[in-house]
Amino acid sequence: MDEVHSILNNVFKLKSFRANQLEAVLATLLNKDVFVLMPTGGGKSLCYQLPALVKSGATKGTTVVISPLISLMQDQVQHLLAKNIKAGMFSSKGGNDDNKHTIHLFREGFLDIVYLSPERANKSNAMQTIMTKLYNNNQLARVVI
């Protein structure tokens, strides 16, 4: 619990959780399935971004986020990188975000959070192989949809 509040304060620069966020964070850290329904701007992202940084929970490894909105993924990754959080993304468009270095970091479990478009998660053999490897090595912390 101390680590959770430390990350909230020191990494995300927030003093407190919004309604239901702490419960969602603690549940995912206990490796429970979590369903979070909040309005836009309600704080859903923190419910998976913060646990991705906690090293003392039951879940360790990379958090994979499936998102259909490329611009949202780009914004989230930039926001996380600005906080020195190891994050990357792979979209259906490929291109610059698909560089070999980011793929290597994902494959080796060095990223805290990876955003994937549904198309990349579903149709890319490489992404499915990486996720399977991480899962088999207990390095896949959670999948967020």
Label the model's feature ranges.
Residues 25-26, 100-103, 128, 132:
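Short hydrophobic/charged patches on amphipathic alpha-helices used for structural packing
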Residues 90-100, 118-123:
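Conserved helicase motor
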Residues 99-114:
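Conserved motor-coupling elements within RecA-like helicase/translocase cores
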Residues 111-112, 119-145:
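SF2 helicase catalytic motif II
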Residues 1-39:
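Conserved pre-motif I regulatory segment
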Residues 37-42, 47-86, 109-112, 141:
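Conserved SF1/SF2 helicase motif Ia
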Residues 75-80, 101-102, 130, 144:
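Alpha-helical scaffold elements adjacent to nucleotide-binding pockets in ATP/GTP-utilizing enzyme cores
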